[in-house]
Amino acid sequence: MASQRISNEPAYVLHRYDWSESSLILDVFTRHHGRVALVARGAKKPSSSFRPILLPLQPLHVAFGGDAEIRNLKSAEWQGGHVMPSGDALLSGYYLNELLMRLLARDDPHPLLFDAYAATVQLLASQNPDTLQLALRAFELRLLQGIGLLPRLDAETATLTPLAPHQRYVLVAEAGLRQAHDDDRFSLSGAQWQALQQALGGKSLFSDTLQACVACANELKIQLRALLHYHCGVRVLKTRQMMMDLQAL
């Protein structure tokens, strides 16, 4: 059976590895085919058309084919639209990529998550410090929901009891959403959790999730970080450790 060729596929490079003196292995997030591994033959040659294009956090359209685990990249076209993020925004973009590399299975399509990623990268490229943390929280929520690791945020996980709007609740990796205890430093009101659930529901836009994070971004950051580290199986993500090391200089 002939191998399938995919053309004009929206994609972002998540990571790239040296494969030979002249070629690269790419880990690519595509809209309709999920996370795929591609070999870009000759991409390291000075004359290669791939050389200036295969960069992280840049929107591409790619064509690839083959029936092996690592398929052949046939073409790649930069779609433009924004500049490369820099500074904290660049490190935040690498953080998003590390999350996708750790949590997404290969060849598992998530078109809505891809759209959320693209929207987040555009916000990072805008270099607006006021939206950076909001964009990260909104994407983390969309990622966890998209891969089935986020419980419903309008009910206690253990009992399915609807949240009381004025009661405080916390999201715990092992137990889901529960009532906050006196020693829980970070918690959200039931109304805030319900607003997040509503923003994540149905066919809502990424901007809805972004807006719902405005009132609770700091408290949400601590809880989502613990949940993500738990599911990634690490104490600290590499990109987060890099951020902490740079801040300590």
Curated annotation (Swiss-Prot):
Gene3D superfamilies: Nucleic acid-binding proteins (2.40.50.140), Recombination protein O, C-terminal domain (1.20.1440.120). Keywords: DNA damage, DNA recombination, DNA repair. Signal peptide: none annotated. One of its GO terms (biological process) is DNA recombination. One of its GO terms (cellular component) is bacterial nucleoid. InterPro entries: ARFGAP/RecO (IPR037278), DNA_rep/recomb_RecO_N (IPR022572), NA-bd_OB-fold (IPR012340), RecO (IPR003717), RecO_C (IPR042242). Involved in DNA repair and RecF pathway recombination. NCBIfam families: reco. Belongs to the RecO family. PANTHER family: DNA REPAIR PROTEIN RECO. This is DNA repair protein RecO.
